[in-house]
């Protein structure tokens, strides 16, 4: 399947929102208390999940197109997704820690973690999530989202990205100029 820029943006928005909801539910259940959002944005969206969703889909498409044995393609895509998403998680964690002096996640209590930004346990979880995304979630999302007329999709994308941009700009200004907003730590 070939996706144009608008479809990539649409999936970025949907998976950023679904990732935020999934993490909120997971943290609430794991901590046995109502989870309060951590992060840079304050509007129920996590860009890392949106980027990772697109990256995973593209890795699976690339492997399906280039590796003719379907089992080998599946294994390569899953391992590629684990590697790519883990690398992205490490880079994002490192940048957020260095730039904003705040860790938004901390795997220091997990064995074999690297600088507490990544660990094998969560990397394997990314592999499982990539299989669920590609085999169950994404096919349903394609059907649901493509049922919406194109001009409405474009309008929605522009509106949501505008809100995200304003939110990010506002929070960046508050952090950089010390006006009270701070990232919520783990």
Regions found by a protein language model. Name each.
Residues 1-186:
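Aromatic-rich, lipid-facing transmembrane alpha helices and their immediate juxtamembrane interface loops
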